[in-house]
Amino acid sequence: MEHYLSLFIKSVFIENMALSFFLGMCTFLAVSKKVSTAFGLGVAVIFVLGLSVPANQLVYSLLKDGAIVEGVDLTFLKFITFIGVIAALVQILEMFLDKFVPALYNALGIYLPLITVNCAIFGAVSFMAQREYGFGESVVYGFGAGLGWMLAIVALAGITEKMKYSDAPKGLKGLGITFIAAGLMAMAFMSFSGIQL
């Protein structure tokens, strides 16, 4: 149990997808203008990561040498299968949001289908394969990585909303000041890097 708790804390704070590895920055910067939209996208990322990392762990275990047929190693197919599983989960999420939460579906716009190619999603799945997590570890890691990404985007959206009322220099208005805020947040998250769990 202690191992899973440390893996969860590590994936949320120490190895934050957005602020430590700088993965998923396209949607991270583009959708961080309003807290409500950022929260909705964060929940979507938690859903996709929480399901795609364990699902891909199961698929990856079937691709390993001798898993299906003795002497057959299908690990060269891992990237294409990872992308297929992620794309299927994003399509399910997109249909669900379109049917039951149309306001969020419209607010996210093009960024919802872009979760399919969000490098934070693929990065978490790749880290799972590289670190050879078991099924339980992949569930904890996927949920923790999604929660960490959501924490970062909601915090940045809150800062961005407050900066609307600030007197930023003309050349830094918009994405410029957002990059600076994200950089300062990343520096703050670097303080967690010294923690060994």
From Swiss-Prot:
Residue spans crossing the bilayer: 11-31, 35-55, 76-96, 108-128, 139-159, 175-195
Enzyme Commission number: 7.2.1.1
Entry's Gene Ontology BP terms: respiratory electron transport chain; sodium ion transport
Superkingdom as given in the UniProt entry: Bacteria
Annotated membrane topology: Multi-pass membrane protein
Signal peptide start-end: none
A GO molecular-function descriptor: oxidoreductase activity, acting on NAD(P)H, quinone or similar compound as acceptor
This protein's GO CC annotations: Gram-negative-bacterium-type cell wall; plasma membrane
Swiss-Prot/TrEMBL keywords: Cell inner membrane, Cell membrane, Ion transport, Membrane, NAD, Sodium, Sodium transport, Translocase, Transmembrane, Transmembrane helix, Transport, Ubiquinone
Subcellular location: Cell inner membrane
Predominant localisation class: membrane
Reactions the enzyme catalyzes: a ubiquinone + n Na(+)(in) + NADH + H(+) = a ubiquinol + n Na(+)(out) + NAD(+)
InterPro entries for this protein: NqrDE/RnfAE, NqrDE/RnfAE_oxidrdctase, NqrE
Function per UniProt: NQR complex catalyzes the reduction of ubiquinone-1 to ubiquinol by two successive reactions, coupled with the transport of Na(+) ions from the cytoplasm to the periplasm. NqrA to NqrE are probably involved in the second step, the conversion of ubisemiquinone to ubiquinol.
Family per similarity comment: Belongs to the NqrDE/RnfAE family.
NCBIfam families tied to this protein: nqrE (TIGR01940)
Assembly and binders: Composed of six subunits; NqrA, NqrB, NqrC, NqrD, NqrE and NqrF.
Protein name: Na(+)-translocating NADH-quinone reductase subunit E
